[in-house]
């Protein structure tokens, strides 16, 4: 940790190779880091921006469904992913939530239902009905277990019911 700016260029595989026409988007990230003028690192693992949320003080929120998905980095387990986060973004602590909401084709991106609103505050969606209620309750329970350890304030936000267009 020298305090100097640098970038991390994670690999992008279109959310587990779901969209062949978007696989080329990985090149866009390479162009961004190259044109930024700052040194950059390439860990060589798949990670999309919405798969993690960081509080700025070394704490990451993520889901097992996303980062441990075999369509991303089948050769990595939880411990190895934590090592990458510690090494490349100086985040030694990770709160692993279970999974994301139904119908999310990104395989459980955290940014669909939980975010840091400050370094010590987490907003998390909840629903008392519908298909997302059980997983949101499970994720809330995991946050509750972690809040004292990390000194977090938790706030629930109601998740609206899905709207389907015909």
Report each predicted region and the residues it spans.
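The feature marks the mature, well-folded catalytic cores of soluble enzymes
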Residues: 1-166
């Amino acid at each position: 940790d020298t305090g100097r700016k640098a970038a991390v260029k994670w690999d992008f595989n279109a959310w587990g190779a779901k969209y062949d026409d978007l696989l080329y988007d990985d090149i866009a990230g390479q162009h961004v880091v190259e044109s930024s003028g700052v040194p950059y690192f390439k860990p060589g693992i798949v990670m999309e921006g919405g798969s993690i949320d960081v509080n700025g003080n070394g704490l990451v929120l993520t889901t097992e469904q996303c980062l441990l998905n075999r369509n991303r980095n089948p050769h990595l387990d939880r411990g190895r992913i934590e090592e990458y986060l510690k090494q490349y973004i100086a985040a030694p602590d990770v709160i692993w939530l279970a999974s994301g909401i139904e119908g999310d084709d990104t395989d459980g991106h955290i940014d669909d239902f939980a975010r840091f609103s400050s370094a010590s505050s987490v907003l998390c969606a909840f629903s008392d009905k519908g298909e997302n209620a059980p997983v949101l309750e499970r994720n809330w329970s995991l946050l509750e277990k972690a809040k004292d350890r990390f000194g977090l304030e938790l706030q629930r936000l109601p998740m609206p019911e899905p709207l389907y267009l015909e």
